[in-house]
C-alpha cells in the first residue's frame, strides 16, 4: 500500500495560534482562505524553496498535516514560475489534521533552517 506523505504549510509566527480550536484558514502571508480560494500547501521537497521565495524575513512555524484527516479537496496544480505542481487545499485545515507545529530556527547566515524538520529525500 502506498503511504500518503504529509503535507506542509508555513505559517508566520504572528498568524499561528497554537491554542486556537477553530480550523486554520490563513492561506499565505496574511491572506485568508476566503480571499485566496485555497490554502497553499507543499510537499516536503518544496518547503525550503517556498520559504526562500516568500518567508525569508519572517519568523515561521512549519505545520505538518496528515492528509488523511483533511476533509476538503486537495488538488495539485502547476505553478509555472516554480516548474512544479503544488498541493492546494480548497477548505480549512482541521486542527486534528495538524500533526505538529514547529517554529523554524535560523542558521548562522540568517536563513530558515529546516534541518531535522522534514523527512530526508528518497
Name these PLM-found stretches.
Residues 1-122:
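Conserved, structured core segments of small domains
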Amino acid at each position: 500500500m502506498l503511504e500518503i506523505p504529509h503535507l506542509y504549510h508555513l505559517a508566520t509566527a504572528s498568524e499561528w495560534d497554537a491554542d486556537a480550536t477553530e480550523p486554520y484558514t490563513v492561506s499565505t502571508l496574511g491572506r485568508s482562505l476566503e480571499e485566496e480560494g485555497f490554502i497553499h500547501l507543499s510537499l516536503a521537497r518544496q518547503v525550503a524553496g517556498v520559504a526562500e521565495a516568500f518567508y525569508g524575513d519572517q519568523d515561521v512555524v512549519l505545520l505538518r498535516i496528515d492528509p488523511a484527516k483533511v476533509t476538503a479537496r486537495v488538488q495539485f496544480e502547476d505553478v509555472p514560475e516554480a516548474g512544479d505542481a503544488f498541493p492546494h487545499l480548497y477548505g480549512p485545515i482541521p486542527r486534528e489534521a495538524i500533526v505538529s507545529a514547529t517554529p523554524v530556527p535560523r542558521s548562522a547566515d540568517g536563513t530558515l533552517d529546516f534541518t531535522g524538520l522534514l523527512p530526508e529525500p528518497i
